[in-house]
Regions:
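N-terminal intrinsically disordered/low-complexity leader segments
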Residues: 1-19, 26, 204-213
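Hydrophobic/aromatic-rich alpha-helical bundle segments in the mid-to-C-terminal region
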Residues: 127-131, 135, 149-197, 204-213
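Amphipathic alpha-helical segments used for helix-helix packing
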Residues: 105-128
Length: 213
């Protein structure tokens, strides 16, 4: 069947294909967060978005593909908002802002990450796209660290890939250990993160920061 015909079948009357896709992604984030990945049927997401199952499949080949697509969309939106809030912010300051928000975030992306990680352990259909997604996040973080090294914010002796892995592990851990399970004081958490980020600086810069304190 012609691809354009398939996409036209997946549209809501008076709504573009892009708007239908966005509606499906928002519905998926809400339904996955409410019912979990295993407890969610494709029909549940289609109904929440106000479309048919056929319309959903015109945009996404499977429930697993929809989960990861929702993750990518919400993740990009959060990052875009952070950059827009302060375009002149340094990379290490950006990492601190993201880090400070981790324990108290209530965004759909955090819920989607948890559902994706849990489902990936037992479902290969989820594991494959989740590996790709995590790889993309790690690559983005590593590029960010390389840019910080070029600006003498981060020690060139440190591995960007290792720092990216640490950041991912921190983000995934705080998504799993929510404030309801174990709260942490905002000021104490921020102080700890500040020390960690300061330790990433080149030795001369780090020594100057320590002397200033």
């Amino acid at each position: 069947m012609n691809v354009l015909l398939i996409l036209s079948m997946g549209r809501i009357a008076g709504v573009t294909a892009a708007e239908t896709r966005e509606r499906l992604l928002r519905a998926a984030a809400d339904v996955f967060a409410d019912r979990g990945y295993d407890g969610t049927r494709v029909a549940d997401i289609a109904a929440a978005a106000g479309v048919s199952n056929g319309a959903l499949y015109a945009h996404f080949g499977s429930k697993a593909e929809l989960l990861v697509a929702a993750l990518r969309t919400h993740g990009r939106r959060l990052l875009a908002d952070l950059f827009a809030a302060d375009p002149d912010r340094s990379i290490t300051e950006l990492l601190l802002v993201i880090g400070r928000s981790l324990p108290k975030r209530r965004d759909p992306c955090g819920n989607l990450v948890v559902e994706g990680l849990v489902a990936a352990r037992r479902d290969q259909d989820v594991a494959r796209p989740m590996r790709d997604y995590m790889g993309e996040r790690a690559d983005w973080l590593a590029e960010l660290i390389r840019a910080a090294q070029a600006d003498v914010e981060v020690d060139r002796a440190l591995s960007p890939d290792a720092i990216a892995h640490f950041c991912l592990s921190l983000a995934m851990g705080t998504a799993l250990v929510t404030p309801a399970l174990h709260p942490v004081d905002d000021d104490e958490w921020g102080l700890l993160l500040g020390r960690i980020v300061a330790a990433l600086a080149p030795s001369a810069v780090s020594a100057q920061a320590g002397a200033a304190q």
